[in-house]
């Protein structure tokens, strides 16, 4: 799996080179005086955005380390639930069963939408017949019902399809399963590494795969994007405009989930999340994704500041009560 080398921290595929969970060891809480760490895990789709955020963050926060792995959205939530991380990167919304496990442990959290993405369907660049597909046709391909291109469209070649998919640890897999497969099993070659999926499609003339928009953008000289046709005959393709306004059929938000306790007790975590929202998606754009509307960041930042202000007032009240006793 690809390793993202960050300025001031390191993101690894399965683990993070920091202590057990983030902590704050002092400092005033601003800029160069801020000290401590915050730890995350999760989506490989979100990882490039975190990398860009860290490049900016580390310039003024050399003693405030942020680290996040890219083991996949599902694996990230497992560590989040187990209490091993302060935040979790996700390319899908948290599932009901994950919410229940957090609730059972008394773990409260904030959900932050940090960017927009469009799951992109791509075929080999030498494929000259697949230009658009319906969700139903994609379902036939990825369920194994359509084994050749001719099974998808009678005018296409009678050649075996080589369908490739992320594995079930990825939020992209979950998203595709829900949006395209109607939760029917995906029967395709599965890979934990998105770069390996891209490579498989580029090397196989009958290949087809799906991944985040930025992975397509980085490899569009080797791949051919497939447009999506809906039930009404409307055809959409992933562009920054269609992804941001949600008109692309496979648009989705990208998230960071942060524990309330970490936001309240770990100054590095709270300052980093304010930094993320104040960035207003520029890091996402730099990483090849699409920023959310500015009002989305402002609204979330206002909510976060209100939450932190209430916590600080509560702490001061508790301190005064202790002194009075």
Swiss-Prot record:
What broad taxonomic lineage does this protein's source fall under? Answer: Bacteria, Bacillati, Bacillota, Bacilli, Bacillales
Is Signal there in the keyword field? Answer: yes
GO cellular component term of the entry, any: plasma membrane
Spell out the molecular function terms from Gene Ontology: phosphate ion binding
Q: SUPFAM superfamilies in the record, alphabetically?
A: Periplasmic binding protein-like II
Cross-referenced Gene3D superfamilies, in alphabetical order? Periplasmic binding protein-like II (3.40.190.10)
Q: Where in the cell is it found?
A: Cell membrane
Q: What's the protein name?
A: Phosphate-binding protein PstS
Residue segments, region Disordered:
23-46
Residues in coiled coil: none
* Topology with respect to the bilayer: Lipid-anchor
Gene behind this chain? Answer: pstS
Lipid moiety-binding residues (S-diacylglycerol cysteine): 21
Q: Which GO terms describe its biological process?
A: phosphate ion transport
What is the role of this chain?
A: Part of the ABC transporter complex PstSACB involved in phosphate import.
The protein's matches in PANTHER family, at most eight in alphabetical order, are given as: PERIPLASMIC PHOSPHATE BINDING COMPONENT OF PHOSPHATE ABC TRANSPORTER, PHOSPHATE-BINDING PROTEIN PSTS
Family assignment from sequence similarity: Belongs to the PstS family.
Broad class of where this protein is predominantly found: membrane
Q: Is-annotated flag, keyword Signal? A: yes
NCBIfam families documented for this protein? ptsS_2
What keywords are annotated for this sequence in UniProt?
Cell membrane, Lipoprotein, Membrane, Palmitate, Phosphate transport, Signal, Transport
* Annotated signal peptide: 1-20
Q: Where is the lipid attached (N-palmitoyl cysteine)?
A: 21
What is the protein's quaternary organization? The complex is composed of two ATP-binding proteins (PstB), two transmembrane proteins (PstC and PstA) and a solute-binding protein (PstS).
What Pfam families does the record point to?
Answer: PBP_like_2 (PF12849)
